[in-house]
């Protein structure tokens, strides 16, 4: 009976969190590896289900997904893939307002360190609170807030530098 209850509880956990874990995996490992990362994440969750924190399941699952991704990819290769994806996204034609700003931000983001990118995207793309994001990267909330502040400053400087470079390249009239 307990096994059936655990299976039902795990099924509910999967249904509640699968999309967010998948989105996290796609954003960090790309679509080709996302299904494998999600499968391994939930396999770890099933094996550790008795010890898993129920009140903070999503941050715990995202932390597991993070570890799965890091085990699969070395930092240099991962950086190359993310930078390539961001350049592709920035190069896509987009008729919406702010195309230049979007391109500048994505290019600047691609130039940041992996830790800065992850810190910024956990908040901006994944919609996590600083507290939940701190759990994902396995640090305290105050330490994460410092990381976030510094990453935002570095991103702002990179965008400003890109804007200055663009202005310098424009022909004078």
Which role does the model predict for each range below?
Residues 66, 131, 137-161:
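DNA-recognition helix of helix-turn-helix
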Residues 104-113:
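Short amphipathic alpha-helical boundary/capping segments
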Residues 119-120:
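A short pre-motif secondary-structure segment
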Residues 1-12, 22-40, 49-56:
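Short, charged helix-capping/linker segments at alpha-helix termini
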Residues 1-5, 9, 136, 152-173:
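C-terminal edge and immediately downstream basic/flexible tail or linker adjoining helix-turn-helix-like DNA-binding
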Residues 71, 79-102, 129, 168-172:
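Internal acidic/polar
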Residues 62-84, 97-98, 157, 161-163:
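Arg/Lys-rich amphipathic alpha helix in sigma70-family domain 2
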Residues 18, 39-48, 55-78, 148-152:
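Σ70-family region 2.3-2.4 aromatic/basic alpha-helix that recognizes the −10 promoter
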